[in-house]
Amino acid sequence: MTTEEALQTIVRVVAPYVGETMARSAAQAHCQKLGVGTDIGRDQLDALISRLGSGLNIFLGREKSSRVVTELRAAMGFGSGA
């Protein structure tokens, strides 16, 4: 998957909770910290989702953040077992 495709999906899922600008800037910042290039691997994507989930805890609380992370994992094709 390209990083841009992943970012678009993240923004689509997370923006209703924190706004488009916050969703995009947080995802991009975490991509930089993880050393993500043009394409994002499954392990990097998993790490990115985990980091975003940790940040969402602050804004949404653990329960709602967990639901958003589950939704995000499903949107990225991780399925229910990931």
Task: Go through the PLM ranges and name each one.
Residues M1-T2, A6-L7, V36, R42-Q44:
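Short leucine-rich amphipathic alpha-helices used at interfaces
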Residues E5, A29-Q32, A47, T70, ...:
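Polar/charged alpha-helical tracts
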Residues V13-E20, Q32-G37, S54-R62, F78:
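Amphipathic alpha-helical interaction surfaces
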Residues G37-L72:
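Short, charged early-sequence alpha-helical segments and their helix-coil boundaries
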